[in-house]
Each structure stands twice: as structure tokens, then as C-alpha cells.
Amino acid sequence: MALMSIVQFKGTYPLFGGEQASSSALDLTLDQTKDDDSDWEIKPLNIMKSRSQGFRPVYIYSNVTPDHMDQYSQEKQDQIILALTKANDDKANLSPRAEPHFFVDLAANDALVLSNTFVLEKNGWEGVCIEANPEYWYRLASFRTCTIIGAAVGGKPEDDGLEVDFALKGVLGGVVRPGLDNNEENSENVIQVKRNLVSILTIFNQTNVPHVIDYMSLDVEGAESLVMEHFPWIDYSFKFLTIERPKDDLKEKLKLNGYKMVLVLTLYGETLWIHQPSVLLPLEEIWSIAGEYNNTHFTRVTD
């Protein structure tokens, strides 16, 4: 009786910073072609080459149905962005568009719950969802069509691979560093893992992000300045952005590059920004459109 089976040798391969991760490094064919008690012939089928850095594909198989398809963002950011984009396209005579609208979601967190971009996808948008916490990857791959990047973001391309501590605490997790929401004082009893920073420009190059982006959602628990510190503003622009509690240095960079804060959408500091050269809508119209979806907490910004 002939018997064929595949076994995998479990090895390790180095990631950024020398971190070791489990991987299938060697596949072996065990082929018994004579009697049951004959010797096994071991043949190497494939040896996975060790890679020290860079992006790797992860293929997640899923056959599940979303539990709640009617999820919306926390303060109707998704509805506001859809309405503002439609109005701006009409004003610029860009309707209908030949290409889908595009978003960048950082950090994406859950695929559906409180997502700022799930509804955009339901309306035909394409985009990139960036999320460092593997807790969210399965649902993102199962329920979303966006390109998923599993990485902690920050720094400039030449510093890609810098090792940092990352707090795994759901939607409030993130890079652990002084001055950020996750710092050594409040992360002592939180699970922390080592992660490697990669610049947002490296991600954009990897995923062929268009140079004019319709919307960016930026909420990384106080690390927004770290993400955007070396951003190439001359090469990329965002028509609309929502940013949670941007620090003064990021606000200044935005203003210097043609952006204007027009609304504070929440009591916890979610702000709406426009790229003035790209958005043709007057402030009164922006406020009016936003007020149709969120008129409880938002504050108009006039200066």
C-alpha cells in the first residue's frame, strides 16, 4: 500500500530587529511506496528563504458573514465624508468619476464596529487599512475589500525597522513612548509586544496609493505627529482628513501645506480638515452638510 503525507518542519525566520517568528521553513514528502513497514524516503520539497525585512503576504481564508452590516462610525464621520465628497465633486464637475474614490484608514481597528471607512467601501470606495494589532486582521480580511497593512507606522523611510514597544489593548492600543497616550506609566499592566516602525511613505509606495487621496482617517492614540512627522506633503494630498486630537506641531504642518481645520466633531477632539486647493466648498456649506449628520457635539472653526 502506498501512503503519501506532508509534514512541516517548524522553524523561525528573522524579522526587523532580529525578532524571531514561527514559520514553516521546510516541507518534506514522506513517501512509502512498498510495504507498510518499509523505510520512509524523505525528500525536501521547498525551502522557504529567510527574509530579514519588508512586507510579506498573509492569506486569510474566511467564509463568514458580517454580523452587523449597518455599522457606522462613532460620530458619523463616514456619512459626512460621503456627503462632502459628493458635493465637492459636483462643484468641480467631477461627477461621475472614472476612478473610485480612495481612502487611507490609520488605524483601522475593527472591520465594522466604529469604522470610519466601512460605509465608504459599501459605496464603491477603495483604500488602504493600516492596523498593527493582529487581533483585528481576521475580521478586516473577512469583511473588507481594502488593502490591509499590518504595521506600526512612524518615522522616515531610512529608519524603517526601528523597534518599538506596542501596547495591545484594543482600540486604545498603540506605540508606547513618552508623550503618547500609551506611555510607560499607563502601560505597565498591559500586554506589550515588539513591533517595527515603517514610514507611511514606504506603505504608500508599497500599495501604489494615488497621489490625490480623497479621505484619510488618522487616529493612533496620540501618535499622529509620529506618523506624519516626515510626510512628503508635496507628493501627496488629502482632500478631507479627520484627525483625533492633533498636536500643535502637526497642526502647523497642515496649515503650512494648505490645510484648514473646519470642524471639531466630538467632545474628545476629533477634527475635520480640508485641503483648500482641492475643496471648492465654502465653509458655510461644509458646516451645513456636516450638521445634517452630526449637530450635537461639533464646533465650527472659523480662524
PLM-predicted stretches and their roles:
Residues 1-303:
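Phosphate/nucleotide-binding beta-alpha loop and adjacent structural elements of enzyme active sites
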